[in-house]
Curated annotation (Swiss-Prot):
Its main location: cytoplasm. This is Protein king tubby. The keyword Nucleus applies. SUPFAM superfamilies: Tubby C-terminal domain-like (SSF54518). Residues 123-155 have a biased composition (Polar residues).
Length: 459
C-alpha cells in the first residue's frame, strides 16, 4: 500500500505541474482562428470516454476482482465482514488510481499536442457543413434556432452575428443599395457588387494584359481575386531572408505568377523589393514594381511604386501606408492594423500622391493631419473571443485553415460587411490572400509582406 500511495503522490504532483503549464499556455491566447473551422477541445475532460486505460496493480489486483478466490462471503462472521470491507476499500482505492492514471495520460497527450504545434499557428479541422434544417444552429454549441446554408467567400458577417458569437457557419447576404456610404465619396462603394447565396454573384478575376501593368491596376468593382503566397526558406540565407511568391489561383489547381518579393540584406530598416520577374528581384530589374519600407520599430510601413524619388517629372508615388499599433486584445493578442490608401477618382483610378514631391504631402502626413479628402482608411476586423475554442476567431469562409497572429481581414469602419482584403495561413509556408476593389495586386502583396516582418514594439 505504501508503494501505491507514493505513486499517487508523484502522479498528483505531475498533474498539478501539467495543469499549471496548460493554464500558463492559455493565459496568452494570441492566435486568430478561422471561425468556420472546428478546433479540438482544450480540456481533456471534454474528450470522448470511449478510450480506456488499463493498469496492473501488482499483487493487490486480485482483491478488487469479483472472482477473488480468497474472499470470505459469510453473513455472520465478523472476520468475513472485515475482509469484505477491506476489499471494498481497496477496490475504491484502485479505482481512484486508475482514474488518476487516466487523467494523467490525457494531460500528457494534451501537452504533447501543444508542444508539437507551431509557435504562430495551431492546426484545426474543418467542420462538416450542415444541411438546411429548421432547428440547425450556426455554431457547434449554439442553441438559437436558425436556417443555415452553405457559406461562400462572397458572404460576410453582420454585426448581429458578432454580438451573439454565432460565427461558425454564419454567412449572411450582403445588403444591397446602401443609402449613404463614405465609399461613394472616395469611389470605394461596393454596393454594385451582386450578392448571392454562394453560387456565382461575384466573378473571380483573371489577368488582363501584361503582368507588370495588371499588378498596378486597381481591381474592378464586383471582381474577387483569390491568390496564394508561398514562402521559400530554402538556401543559405533564406532562413533569415526568405523569398515570397504571389500567384493568382485558377481552376483545377492551376496558378499564374504575379509578383515576387524579398527582404534586402543591407538596409537599416526592413526594406522589401517587389518584382514581377521571379528570376531577378532587384531594383535594377526590368520587372521592378516597387518596394515596401518600414520605420526602425517596424510599426509603420510605406509602399512605393517603381518611380524615382529624385525625379521631378514623374516622382515616386505612395501606394499605401500600413500602421501596426499595440495588440488590441492583450499583450499577446491579435494585431491592430490601420491601412491608408490613396482615394479613387470617378473613373476608378487612384489619386496620385507623392511624398517625394516637395509640392505634395505624402499619405502618412495627410493621415497625421486628419486630411482625409484624398485618402481612405481601413482597419482590420476585430476578432471575437470564442469560449468553446478558447481563441479569437474570424470567419474566413474556408480560405484559412490554421491559426496565426498574421491572419486578418481589412474592412472600412462604416461598411464592415465589405471585406477589402483577407490574409491567412493554410500551412507552414503557404498563405491565402484575397483582395477586392480598390486594391491592386501590388498593394495587397505589400500589405501581406508587412505582416510577415518582425515588429519590435508590437510583439
Amino acid at each position: 500500500m505504501s508503494a501505491i500511495s507514493s505513486r499517487n503522490q508523484k502522479m498528483e504532483q505531475q498533474r498539478q505541474l501539467m495543469e499549471a503549464y496548460i493554464r500558463q499556455k492559455r493565459a496568452s491566447p494570441g492566435m486568430v482562428q478561422a471561425s468556420d473551422l472546428q478546433i479540438s477541445r482544450p480540456m481533456s475532460g471534454m474528450r470522448s470516454n470511449s478510450r480506456e486505460l488499463h493498469a496492473y496493480d501488482g499483487p493487490m489486483q486480485f482483491i478488487s476482482s469479483p472472482h477473488n478466490p480468497d474472499q470470505i462471503l459469510t453473513n455472520g462472521s465478523p472476520v468475513g465482514g472485515t475482509v469484505a470491507m477491506n476489499s471494498t476499500r481497496n477496490h475504491s482505492n484502485n479505482m481512484r488510481t486508475l482514474s488518476t492514471i487516466s487523467q494523467e495520460a490525457d494531460l500528457i497527450e494534451e501537452i504533447s499536442s501543444h508542444e508539437l504545434e507551431d509557435e504562430e499557428s495551431s492546426p484545426v479541422t474543418v467542420i462538416e457543413q450542415q444541411q438546411t434544417a429548421p432547428h440547425s444552429a450556426n455554431s457547434t454549441h449554439s442553441q438559437r434556432p436558425s436556417t443555415t446554408r452553405q457559406p461562400s467567400f462572397n458572404d460576410t458577417l453582420d454585426e448581429d452575428d458578432y454580438t451573439n458569437r454565432n460565427i461558425a457557419g454564419a454567412a449572411p447576404v450582403r445588403p444591397v443599395g446602401l443609402a449613404s456610404s463614405p465609399y461613394k465619396e472616395a469611389g470605394l462603394d461596393g454596393s454594385s457588387m451582386e450578392t448571392s447565396n454562394g453560387a456565382g454573384g461575384e466573378s473571380e478575376g483573371d489577368v488582363i494584359g501584361n503582368i507588370d501593368q495588371f499588378v498596378m491596376q486597381p481591381a474592378p468593382q464586383g471582381v474577387l481575386y483569390k491568390c496564394r503566397i508561398t514562402r521559400d526558406r530554402k538556401g543559405m540565407d533564406r532562413g533569415l531572408f526568405p523569398i515570397y511568391y504571389l500567384h493568382l489561383e485558377r481552376d483545377y489547381g492551376k496558378k499564374i505568377f504575379l509578383l515576387g518579393g524579398r527582404k534586402r540584406k543591407k538596409s537599416k530598416t526592413s526594406n522589401y523589393i517587389v518584382s514581377c520577374d521571379p528570376t531577378d528581384l532587384s531594383r535594377s530589374a526590368d520587372g521592378f514594381c516597387g518596394k515596401l519600407r518600414s520605420n526602425v520599430f517596424g510599426t509603420s510601413f510605406t509602399v512605393f511604386d517603381s518611380g524615382n524619388k529624385d525625379s521631378t517629372d514623374s516622382p515616386r508615388l505612395d501606394l499605401a501606408v500600413i500602421i501596426y499599433d499595440t495588440n488590441i486584445l492583450g499583450f499577446k493578442g491579435p494585431r491592430n492594423m490601420t491601412v491608408i490608401l490613396p482615394g479613387m477618382t470617378e473613373d476608378d483610378q487612384r489619386v496620385k500622391i507623392s511624398s517625394a514631391d516637395p509640392k505634395q504631402t505624402g499619405i502618412l502626413d495627410l493621415y497625421k493631419m486628419k486630411n482625409m479628402d484624398n485618402i481612405v482608411e481601413l482597419h482590420n476586423k476585430t476578432p471575437v473571443w470564442n469560449d468553446e475554442t478558447q481563441s479569437y476567431v474570424l470567419n474566413f469562409h474556408g480560405r484559412v485553415t490554421q491559426a496565426s497572429v498574421k491572419n486578418f481581414q481589412l474592412v472600412h469602419d462604416s461598411d464592415p460587411e465589405y471585406i477589402v482584403m483577407q490574409f491567412g495561413r493554410t500551412s507552414e509556408d503557404v498563405f491565402t490572400m484575397d483582395y477586392r476593389y480598390p486594391l491592386c495586386a501590388m498593394q495587397a502583396f505589400a500589405i501581406a509582406l508587412s505582416s510577415f516582418d518582425g515588429k519590435i514594439a508590437c510583439e
